[in-house]
Design a protein with these regions (language model features):
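Short, polar loop motifs at secondary-structure junctions
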Residues: 44-49, 172-173
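N-terminal glycine-rich phosphate-binding loop and ensuing alpha1 helix
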Residues: 2-44
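Catalytic phosphate/metal-binding cores of nucleic-acid and nucleotide-processing enzymes, i.e., regions
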Residues: 1-2, 88
């Protein structure tokens, strides 16, 4: 299995979030430190990362192509370009540097599940078993419960939310322009491991842990 990490120099909601420090080290280096047992590829537009990634023997950082730069580019397009350039045939695990509490044991367990199954992909999720509502133009409507019949939450239907902690897949899955194939598995990840740094508030929560 190989690991793919897309890293932009600029971010939209948190300024320079990939370079923000946690315990004296930028988030992107925290991520690399967890994957010493794997070959890691970084797609980046950052000269800093292209230079400093050379400190890691198992890491290959390469410059993002001009037509793939910008906030509108899909991560799937980045992965397809990576797989094509390096002729990747192994399973790919894609992660983000903004999951600072990622545990390598979860990655190894997911990798093992894929090996033992006939699944073409596995992705991380949050389990949700609460009373959910949806806001519509005409008002609000329940999703998974009947407000006129109060049930205990443990009796409600279970929903799962992709949390982007990781996506693991065989390269041919990308033919559908997705990271999730036709026979996927889900992998539950609980708080705080599934924390994703997407706002300044998230960053403050991380620091306070």
């Amino acid at each position: 299995m190989v690991v793919f990490i897309p890293i932009k120099e600029e971010s939209q909601r948190v300024v320079g979030k990939n370079f923000r420090e946690y315990k004296g080290k930028p988030l992107w280096k925290h991520c690399l430190d967890k994957f010493t047992d794997y070959q890691v590829f970084i797609d980046t537009d950052s000269e800093i990362i292209l230079d400093e990634a050379e400190e890691y023997e198992n890491v290959r950082a390469y410059e993002r192509l001009d037509y793939l730069k910008g906030h509108e580019t899909s991560v799937v397009d980045l992965i397809k370009n990576f797989v094509d350039i390096y002729q990747i045939e192994d399973v790919v695990c894609q992660v983000h540097t903004t999951s600072p509490l990622l545990e390598i044991k979860h990655i190894k367990e997911a990798e093992q599940r894929m090996k033992e199954s006939k699944s073409d992909s596995i992705f991380s999720v949050d389990k949700i078993q609460d009373r959910l509502w949806r806001k519509e133009d005409y008002g609000i409507t329940p999703i998974n419960h009947n407000p006129l019949k109060l049930e205990q939450t443990q009796d409600l239907p279970i929903y799962y939310r992709e949390n982007s902690y990781f996506y693991m897949f065989r390269p041919e899955v990308l033919d559908t322009d997705n990271r999730i194939g036709k026979s996927p598995l889900m992998f539950e990840v609980e708080w705080p491991y599934n924390m994703d740094i997407d706002t300044e508030e998230d960053l403050n929560k991380l620091i306070s842990l």
